[in-house]
């Protein structure tokens, strides 16, 4: 005995209703997960790489040198004398595929630098993820 068309359609309607309830909840979690990844990158990997650079060279990279100074020895002054990098394996991009924003000197104590992700909209706004 097979299923009738009505029974199959009822199953499809039930599955669609369940999907309609679950998908919006998962969509919000994706953005939340990206924000968590950006915060972990900023407070973890990138801060550690910047600290290692500072320990080796006695200072953080300048704003002009940027986070690229963690990948290859900067040629612009002040050229680090004791560069032992690379301090990162690849160019750091936030979960939205954009470069992290690095400012040195920082304007938010107690850090000597400001590090942030501009978030999903890619502009400075309330959705940014910051190290301060």
Residue ranges, per PLM feature:
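N-terminal single-pass transmembrane signal-anchor helix
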Residues: 1-26
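A residue-level detector for conformationally permissive "hinge/kink" positions
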Residues: 8-12, 50, 77, 89
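Generic secondary-structure boundary signal with a strong preference for alpha-helix termini
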Residues: 14, 31-32, 109-110
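Short amphipathic alpha-helical leader/targeting segments
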Residues: 16, 40, 111-112
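Conserved hydrophobic/amphipathic alpha-helical signal-anchor segments
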Residues: 22-76
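Periplasmic/extracellular, small/polar-rich flexible segments of pilin-like filament-forming proteins
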Residues: 55-132
């Amino acid at each position: 005995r097979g299923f009738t068309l009505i029974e199959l359609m009822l199953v499809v309607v039930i599955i669609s209703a369940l999907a309609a309830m679950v998908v919006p909840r998962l969509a919000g979690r994706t953005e939340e997960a990206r924000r968590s990844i950006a915060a972990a990158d900023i407070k973890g990997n990138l801060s550690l790489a910047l600290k290692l650079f500072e320990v080796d060279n006695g200072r953080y990279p300048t704003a002009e040198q940027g986070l690229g100074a963690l990948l290859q020895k900067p040629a612009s002054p002040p050229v680090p004398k004791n560069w032992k990098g690379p301090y990162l394996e690849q160019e750091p991009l936030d979960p939205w595929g954009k470069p992290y924003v690095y400012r040195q000197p920082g304007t938010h104590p107690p850090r000597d630098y400001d590090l942030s992700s501009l978030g999903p909209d890619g502009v400075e706004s309330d959705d940014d993820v910051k190290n301060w």
